[in-house]
UniProtKB/Swiss-Prot annotation:
The species this protein was found in: Nematostella vectensis (Starlet sea anemone)
Gene Ontology terms describing biological process: regulation of actin filament-based process
Family: Belongs to the costars family.
Coiled coil: none
The protein's name: Costars family protein v1g158749
């Protein structure tokens, strides 16, 4: 899979798992995304896909590094619906 395709799949999964926040942006906790069986089967490197999406300003999260357990509470915010 290429990065563009994985980012598109990530957007779909964020929409599936997320809830709108007060700004009407879709938000998912990293732990929910990381522990989801469907996401585990789709993404070989979820954190790498999230980083690529963050660089493209498609998602936002307040951490440089995301680690399972440590950062499960971090919000992943969908900025662009692409």
């Amino acid at each position: 899979m290429n990065v563009e395709h994985e980012v598109k799949l990530l957007v779909e999964e964020l929409k599936r798992l997320g809830q709108p926040n007060s700004d009407d942006k879709i938000v998912v906790k990293f732990g929910v995304l990381f522990n989801d069986d469907r996401c585990a089967n789709i993404f070989e490197a979820l954190v790498g896909t999230l980083k690529a999406a963050k660089r493209k300003k498609i998602v936002h999260y307040d951490s440089e590094l995301l680690l399972q357990g440590v950062h499960d509470h971090v919000d992943i915010v969908l900025l662009k619906d692409e």
